UniProtKB/Swiss-Prot annotation:
One of its GO terms (biological process) is L-tryptophan catabolic process to acetyl-CoA. Pathway: Amino-acid degradation; L-tryptophan degradation via kynurenine pathway; L-kynurenine from L-tryptophan: step 1/2. Homotetramer. GO terms for molecular function: heme binding; metal ion binding; tryptophan 2,3-dioxygenase activity. The lineage of its organism: Bacteria, Bacillati, Bacillota, Bacilli, Bacillales. It comes from Geobacillus thermodenitrificans (strain NG80-2). Heme-dependent dioxygenase that catalyzes the oxidative cleavage of the L-tryptophan (L-Trp) pyrrole ring and converts L-tryptophan to N-formyl-L-kynurenine. Catalyzes the oxidative cleavage of the indole moiety. This is Tryptophan 2,3-dioxygenase. It comes from the Bacteria. The gene is kynA. Heme binds at H238. Pfam families: Trp_dioxygenase (PF03301). Its cofactor is heme. Coiled coil: none annotated. Belongs to the tryptophan 2,3-dioxygenase family. Its EC number is 1.13.11.11.
Length: 280
């Protein structure tokens, strides 16, 4: 009797014939996505390793999609639509941060069973992660040779290197609103990592001291702080997870591993948005 109660008939309006119509699996191209987890070993836990990294790359793709649109909104002096995009990016970052706790279920012994299969493949080579860092203002031309084997990605990386970051766009928004910004900042070489500037800090201080007058700039600043803070948390969780799994071994891509990742924690984003808090 219990089994019958748990059964139910499909509602009459539910479609069941997809011979000539698009289905859920067809729309999402699940045949391609779900056939892309190709293990190079017979070890059970390699599937976890692959899926964590593949899903992270999908989330990064969405971050870049939202970030590109947000930067354009700011450059167009249309700040408000960007706030929704930044809020979404922040939620995506939370997903990415949480994914490290899933990967940390992989023990050192389990990882060593298939690590050699990776060769020199490494998260260091994640071009989407590099594009996110570029978009947040941390440019580094020295990483480009890592991607020269793929002309399309190399061109995309080069273009991003020379494009304004979201912080460059935000600083231009300050100038558009009449806040004095040094000319060498407004016309700087975008391929270089942004360096702190007194005029930018003073402009942000003016915004924070006059919130009602500059509400949208204030909101923009706080959205950037959210994203910068989440990115630092992601970096920390990355470092912590790597240390938990491989200790201080060198990375498969040739980096110093945990030591390299720890150095990245010293490179924060949007410097004046942090220093102003002491002076406010």
């Amino acid at each position: 009797m219990q089994n019958k109660q748990n059964q139910f008939e499909l509602e009459k309006g539910i479609h069941t014939d997809f011979q000539e119509e698009m289905s859920y699996a067809g729309y999402l191209q699940l045949d391609k996505i779900l056939s892309s987890q190709q293990r190079l070993s017979n070890h059970h836990d390699e599937m976890l390793f692959i899926i964590i990294h593949q899903t992270s790359e999908l989330w990064m793709k969405l971050i870049l999609h939202e970030m590109e649109a947000a930067i354009q909104c700011i450059l167009d002096d249309d700040l408000e639509p960007s706030f929704k995009m930044f809020a979404r990016i922040s939620r995506i970052q939370q997903q990415l941060i949480q994914s490290w706790s899933v990967l940390s279920t992989l023990t050192p012994s389990e990882y060593m069973e298939f690590r050699e299969c990776l060769g020199h493949a490494s998260g260091f080579q994640s071009y989407q992660n590099r594009l996110i860092e570029f978009a947040l203002g941390q440019k580094n031309a020295h990483v480009l040779p890592v991607f020269q084997h793929d002309p399309e990605i190399y061109e995309k990386m080069t273009r991003a290197l020379h494009s304004p970051s979201v912080y460059d766009a935000a600083i231009k928004a300050l100038a558009v609103r009449g806040l004095p910004i040094d000319e060498d900042v407004l016309h700087r070489d975008y391929s270089q990592t942004y360096q702190p500037n007194a005029s930018v800090e003073e402009a942000w201080l003016t915004v924070y001291r006059n919130v009602d007058r500059y509400w949208d700039l204030y909101e923009l600043a706080e959205k950037l702080v959210d994203i910068g803070s989440q990115q630092q948390t992601w970096r920390y969780m990355h470092m912590n997870t790597v240390e938990r799994i491989i200790g201080y071994k060198k990375g498969t891509g040739g980096s110093s591993g945990v030591s390299y990742l720890k150095k990245s924690l010293d490179r924060s984003f949007f410097p004046e948005l942090w220093t102003l808090r002491t002076k406010l």
